[in-house]
Amino acid sequence: MGNSKSGALSKEILEELQLNTKFSEEELCSWYQSFLKDCPTGRITQQQFQSIYAKFFPDTDPKAYAQHVFRSFDSNLDGTLDFKEYVIALHMTTAGKTNQKLEWAFSLYDVDGNGTISKNEVLEIVMAIFKMITPEDVKLLPDDENTPEKRAEKIWKYFGKNDDDKLTEKEFIEGTLANKEILRLIQFEPQKVKEKMKNA
């Protein structure tokens, strides 16, 4: 499943990535060359991923969020991402289809990987998101969601859960699709992320 360490992206991986993402062959090949230059082993570590993420958010602390994003895409749990996992991470966090993004968001919020989400896991991810919001932007948030605790509480109430309840993937996806307010609360301003990536 991994990539060859030569300078060419395998035809199978290229076709699979084109099919599953919005990226062109030219973009993928160019990114692959850059990826190999920065990661000659053909794999990116969590620390390297966090460094790349930090470039997009120089005025905040994206380390915790980047760590959770990395975990959610490290499908074989080897502590690295190959090029395919890396591109899918980029795609899902910027332009994936809504259902795919929600499946990914569930895996992001399912911190312990047990197949359900607890209120504490929601709080952990929301705290990581808040570290990426500038103090000026936090001041613009409504009073009932201007701290991680308030936002986590608001999300949990939208799902109609008690503090010690768990949320399944099905409930998470259906609840989010049925309520645009939940979608807004669980994500980190994807439009700003897209703009930063385009200008990088």
Swiss-Prot record:
Lipid linkage positions (N-myristoyl glycine): G2
Keyword Membrane in record: yes
Gene Ontology molecular function terms on file: calcium ion binding; calcium sensitive guanylate cyclase activator activity
Tissues of expression: Retina and pineal gland.
Keyword terms of this UniProt record: Calcium, Cell projection, Disulfide bond, Lipoprotein, Membrane, Metal-binding, Myristate, Oxidation, Redox-active center, Repeat, Sensory transduction, Vision
Domain EF-hand span(s) in chain numbering: 25-60, 61-96, 97-132, 147-182
SUPFAM superfamilies documented for this protein: EF-hand
Classification via InterPro entries: EF-hand-dom_pair, EF_Hand_1_Ca_BS, EF_hand_dom, Recoverin
Post-translational modification: The N-terminal glycine is linked to one of four different types of acyl groups. The most abundant is myristoleate (14:1), but 14:0, 14:2, and 12:0 acyl residues are also present. The Ca(2+) induced exposure of the myristoyl group, known as the calcium-myristoyl switch, promotes RCVRN binding to the photoreceptor cell membranes only when intracellular Ca(2+) concentration is high.
This protein's record includes keyword Membrane: yes
Residues annotated as binding Ca(2+) 1: D74, N76, D78, T80, E85
Positions where Cysteine sulfenic acid (-SOH) occurs in the chain: C39
Region (Interaction with GRK1): 189-192
Main location per the UniProt record: other
Sites annotated Interaction with GRK1: K192
Residues involved in Ca(2+) binding: T116
GO biological process: phototransduction; regulation of calcium ion transport; regulation of signal transduction; signal transduction; visual perception
Membrane topology: Lipid-anchor
Assembly and interaction partners: Homodimer; disulfide-linked. Homodimerization is caused by prolonged intense illumination. May form a complex composed of RHO, GRK1 and RCVRN in a Ca(2+)-dependent manner; RCVRN prevents the interaction between GRK1 and RHO. Interacts (via C-terminus) with GRK1 (via N-terminus); the interaction is Ca(2+)-dependent.
Entry domain remark: EF-hand 2 and EF-hand 3 domains are the low-affinity and the high-affinity calcium binding sites, respectively. EF-hand 1 and EF-hand 4 domains do not bind calcium due to substitutions that disrupt their respective Ca(2+) binding loops. The cooperative binding of calcium to the EF-hand 2 domain following EF-hand 3 domain calcium binding requires myristoylation. Calcium binding to the 2 EF-hand domains induces exposure of the myristoyl group through a protein conformation change, this process known as the calcium-myristoyl switch facilitates binding to photoreceptor cell membranes.
Functional note: Acts as a calcium sensor and regulates phototransduction of cone and rod photoreceptor cells. Modulates light sensitivity of cone photoreceptor in dark and dim conditions. In response to high Ca(2+) levels induced by low light levels, prolongs RHO/rhodopsin activation in rod photoreceptor cells by binding to and inhibiting GRK1-mediated phosphorylation of RHO/rhodopsin. Plays a role in scotopic vision/enhances vision in dim light by enhancing signal transfer between rod photoreceptors and rod bipolar cells.
Entries under PANTHER family matching the protein: CALCIUM BINDING PROTEINS, RECOVERIN
Family per similarity comment: Belongs to the recoverin family.
Protein name: Recoverin
